[in-house]
C-alpha cells in the first residue's frame, strides 16, 4: 500500500471517529452509558472476531488475554468518561477535549521517563491549556462537570495508548490483543450495566442506528482499517490526520445537532487544535533538517 492511500484510509477512520461523538449522543437518548458501552464493544468484538476467527484461535494465549483484559478495562474507563461527559457538554467540546490525549501522552512519558519535555511540547501544552480555559470556563459556573469527565477520558486514553505500546511489543500478534480488548471492554460494560443500570436494547430506530454505527463502523471497521493503514505511513502524518477528529466532531455537531460555539469557544478550540498539532509536528524533520541530539523526550 502506498503512503498516500494509507493516509486517505486514516482520513476515513478520522471521519468515523469524529462522527462517534454524535452517535454516542444519540445512543444516550435510548440507553444508559454503561449499557451503550456494552452494546458497542460487544457487537464490535463479535464482528471483528468473526473476521479474524482463525487468527484468534492460533495466537490467543494467557499473556494476550492478560494484556487485553487490562487494556479493555482502561478502554471501558475512557468511554465511560466520555459518555458521562456527553450528558453535560456538547459533542464539539467533547471532541476538542478528547484531542488532549495527543498532549497527555508525551507529558506522561516525560514525567514517568524522567526526561525533559521538548520546547514545542511545552508550548503546545500551554496553548492547549489556554484553549481549554476559553472553551470550557463559564462566567457564572466555571468549568462544567461534563467537560471534566471528557478531560479525564483524554487522560485515561493517553494511559491506554502508552500501555498498548508496551503490550504489542511483547506480543507476536498485536491484532489479537486489539480484538480481545474490545470483548473485555464490552464485558466490563455489561457488568457495570447489571450493577448500576437496567440492561435493555434500544427502543427506537435512531438508537439502533447509533449502536450499529458505533460498533460496526466506528469500532470494528475503524480499528481494522487503522491497523492496516498505519504501518504504511509515518507516526507524524497519522497523528496530524487524527488531530482533525475534533474538527469532524464539531462539523457533525453543527450539521445534525445544531450545536454552535461562541467566538470565545471557537478561539479556544483553535488553540487546542494548534497546541495538539504543534506537539505532534516536527518542523525540522518535515523540512529535511538535521537536529542536534538533545536530552529531551520525543514529543
List where the protein language model places each region.
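C-terminal transmembrane-helix exit sites in multi-pass transporters
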Residues: 47-58, 82, 101-123, 247-267
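C-terminal-most transmembrane helix of multi-pass membrane proteins
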Residues: 40-42, 49, 207-209, 243-299
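Specific transmembrane alpha-helical segments of multi-pass solute transporters/efflux pumps
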Residues: 16, 20-21, 49-98, 134, ...
Amino acid at each position: 500500500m502506498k503512503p498516500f492511500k494509507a493516509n486517505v484510509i486514516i482520513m476515513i477512520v478520522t471521519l468515523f471517529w469524529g462522527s462517534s461523538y454524535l452517535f454516542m449522543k444519540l445512543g444516550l437518548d435510548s440507553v444508559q452509558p454503561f449499557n451503550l458501552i456494552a452494546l458497542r464493544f460487544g457487537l464490535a468484538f463479535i464482528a471483528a472476531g468473526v473476521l479474524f476467527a482463525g487468527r484468534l484461535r492460533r495466537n490467543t494465549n494467557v499473556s494476550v488475554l492478560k494484556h487485553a483484559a487490562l487494556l479493555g478495562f482502561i478502554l471501558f474507563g475512557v468511554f465511560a468518561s466520555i459518555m458521562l461527559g456527553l450528558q453535560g457538554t456538547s459533542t464539539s467540546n467533547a471532541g476538542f477535549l478528547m484531542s488532549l490525549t495527543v498532549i497527555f501522552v508525551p507529558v506522561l512519558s516525560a514525567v514517568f521517563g524522567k526526561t525533559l519535555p521538548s520546547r514545542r511540547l511545552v508550548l503546545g501544552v500551554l496553548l492547549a491549556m489556554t484553549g481549554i480555559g476559553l472553551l470550557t470556563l463559564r462566567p457564572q459556573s466555571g468549568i462544567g462537570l461534563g467537560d471534566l469527565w471528557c478531560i479525564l477520558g483524554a487522560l485515561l486514553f493517553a494511559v491506554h495508548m502508552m500501555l498498548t505500546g508496551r503490550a504489542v511489543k511483547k506480543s507476536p500478534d498485536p491484532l489479537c490483543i486489539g480484538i480481545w480488548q474490545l470483548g473485555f471492554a464490552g464485558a466490563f460494560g455489561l457488568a457495570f450495566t447489571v450493577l448500576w443500570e437496567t440492561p435493555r436494547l434500544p427502543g427506537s430506530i435512531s438508537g439502533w442506528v447509533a449502536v450499529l454505527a458505533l460498533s460496526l463502523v466506528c469500532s470494528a471497521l475503524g480499528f481494522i482499517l487503522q491497523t492496516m493503514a498505519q504501518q504504511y505511513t509515518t507516526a507524524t502524518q497519522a497523528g496530524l490526520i487524527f488531530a482533525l477528529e475534533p474538527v469532524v466532531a464539531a462539523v457533525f455537531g453543527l450539521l445534525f445537532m445544531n450545536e454552535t460555539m461562541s467566538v470565545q469557544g471557537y478561539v479556544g478550540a483553535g488553540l487546542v487544535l494548534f497546541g495538539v498539532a504543534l506537539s505532534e509536528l516536527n518542523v525540522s524533520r518535515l523540512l529535511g533538517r538535521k537536529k542536534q541530539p538533545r536530552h529531551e523526550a520525543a514529543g
